[in-house]
C-alpha cells in the first residue's frame, strides 16, 4: 500500500492520456491539480468548470480512476487495510470519545444536532482547538477551516480553551481559518474553495456551523423543497469528497424542528430530512441537562451501537460529566 500510494503521489495530471499542456492548465486553473481530485469528479462538473468537452472529461476521469485505483471492486481485506489511514480526533471528553469509538473519524461527516443552547457550537470550538494540538496529545497538529453561517465563532472562546490545553492562544488562533457564509450559495462556494486552502495549509478538520440554517431560511414552503434538497445534497457530497481526498474530519452542526404530530416521545427532528440523514456518517443528538451538563446520544453509525453519555461544558471547554 505505501509503495503504491507513493507512486500515485508522484504522478501528475500530465500523465493522464489526452491531457496536454493546454488542458492541464485549464484543469489546474479550475482546481483539478492532482490525480485524485480528477478521479472523484463527475464528467459534467469537470467539463463545465474547466471548459473541456464532456467526452474528453469522461476519458480523463476514467484514466485518473485507474491510476488512483478508485471506483473498482475491492475485497474486504483491501478496504480494511485502507481504513488504517483513518485518524481520529479527540473531542476533549473521554466519554464522548468512547461513544464514537475513539473520536471523530477522518473521511467521514459527523453531525451534531440539537436545540439552541445544547452545546453544538461549543463542541465545534473545542474540536478546532484539539485539531491544532500535537499528535502525541491526540491532536492532528494541523490547521482548521470553519464555515460560519450564523456568526457564532468567538476567538475569545478559543483563547480560553487553548489555555486550558496549555497551548499558545495566538498560535492556535493563527491556525484556525474562518469564513463567514452569508447565504446558501456562498456556503456551497466556500466548501468548494476549501481545497485551495488545503493545498496551501495542512487541513485535517473542516467545520460547518451550522449546516442547514441558510437553506432553511431561504427555501421556505413545499414548492422550494426539491431545490433546497438538491443543493444540500450537492453541498454535503462536496464536504465528504474533501474529507476523503485530504483525510480530514468533517464536523457539522444542525438545527432541529418539532413535529407537532408527535404526542409521545421526543418530537425533535434534525433539519434536512433523508439527504442529511443518509450522507452524515455519524449522527449525535445533544440535549441539555443540569449544571452545564449535556447528554450526547449516538443515533446513527455504520458500525457502532446506539448509546449515550454525559459531557460537561465548562470555561475550560468540553470535559467528562458524571453518568
From Swiss-Prot:
The keyword DNA-binding applies. Disulfide bonds: none annotated. GO terms for molecular function: ATP binding; ATP hydrolysis activity; ATP-dependent DNA damage sensor activity; damaged DNA binding. SUPFAM superfamilies: P-loop containing nucleoside triphosphate hydrolases, Rad51 N-terminal domain-like. Keywords: ATP-binding, DNA damage, DNA recombination, DNA-binding, Nucleotide-binding. Pfam families: HHH_5, Rad51. It comes from the Archaea. The keyword Nucleotidyltransferase does not apply. ATP binds at residues 114-121. One of its GO terms (biological process) is DNA repair. Belongs to the eukaryotic RecA-like protein family. Involved in DNA repair and in homologous recombination. Binds and assemble on single-stranded DNA to form a nucleoprotein filament. Hydrolyzes ATP in a ssDNA-dependent manner and promotes DNA strand exchange between homologous DNA molecules. HAMAP family: RadA_arch (MF_00348). This is DNA repair and recombination protein RadA. It comes from Picrophilus torridus (strain ATCC 700027 / DSM 9790 / JCM 10055 / NBRC 100828 / KAW 2/3). The lineage of its organism: Archaea, Methanobacteriati, Thermoplasmatota, Thermoplasmata, Thermoplasmatales. The gene is radA.
Amino acid at each position: 500500500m505505501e509503495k503504491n500510494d507513493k507512486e500515485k503521489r508522484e504522478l501528475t495530471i500530465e500523465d493522464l492520456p489526452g491531457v496536454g499542456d493546454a488542458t492541464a492548465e485549464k484543469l489546474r486553473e479550475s482546481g483539478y491539480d492532482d490525480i485524485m481530485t480528477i478521479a472523484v469528479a463527475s464528467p459534467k462538473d469537470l467539463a463545465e468548470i474547466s471548459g473541456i468537452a464532456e467526452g474528453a472529461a469522461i476519458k480523463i476521469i476514467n484514466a485518473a480512476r485507474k491510476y488512483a485505483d478508485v471506483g473498482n471492486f475491492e475485497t474486504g481485506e483491501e478496504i480494511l487495510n485502507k481504513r488504517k489511514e483513518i485518524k481520529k480526533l479527540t473531542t476533549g471528553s473521554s466519554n464522548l470519545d468512547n461513544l464514537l469509538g475513539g473520536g471523530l473519524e477522518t473521511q467521514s461527516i459527523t453531525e451534531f444536532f440539537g436545540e439552541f443552547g445544547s452545546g453544538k457550537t461549543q463542541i465545534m470550538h473545542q474540536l478546532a482547538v484539539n485539531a491544532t494540538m500535537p499528535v502525541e496529545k491526540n491532536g492532528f497538529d494541523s490547521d482548521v477551516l470553519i464555515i460560519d453561517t450564523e456568526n457564532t465563532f468567538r476567538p475569545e472562546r478559543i483563547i480560553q480553551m487553548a489555555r486550558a490545553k496549555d497551548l499558545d492562544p495566538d498560535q492556535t488562533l493563527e491556525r484556525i481559518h474562518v469564513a463567514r457564509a452569508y447565504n446558501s450559495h456562498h456556503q456551497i462556494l466556500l466548501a468548494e474553495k476549501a481545497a485551495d486552502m488545503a493545498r496551501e495549509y495542512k487541513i485535517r478538520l473542516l467545520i460547518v456551523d451550522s449546516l442547514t440554517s441558510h437553506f432553511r431560511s431561504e427555501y421556505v414552503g413545499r414548492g422550494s423543497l426539491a431545490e433546497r434538497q438538491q443543493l444540500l445534497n450537492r453541498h454535503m457530497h462536496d464536504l465528504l469528497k474533501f474529507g476523503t481526498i485530504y483525510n480530514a474530519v468533517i464536523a457539522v452542526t444542525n438545527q432541529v424542528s418539532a413535529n407537532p404530530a408527535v404526542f409521545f416521545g421526543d418530537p425533535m427532528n434534525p433539519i434536512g430530512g433523508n439527504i442529511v440523514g443518509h450522507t452524515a456518517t455519524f449522527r449525535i443528538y445533544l440535549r441539555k441537562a443540569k449544571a452545564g451538563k449535556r447528554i450526547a446520544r449516538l443515533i446513527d453509525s455504520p458500525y457502532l451501537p446506539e448509546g449515550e453519555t454525559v459531557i460537561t461544558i465548562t470555561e475550560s471547554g468540553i470535559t467528562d460529566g458524571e453518568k
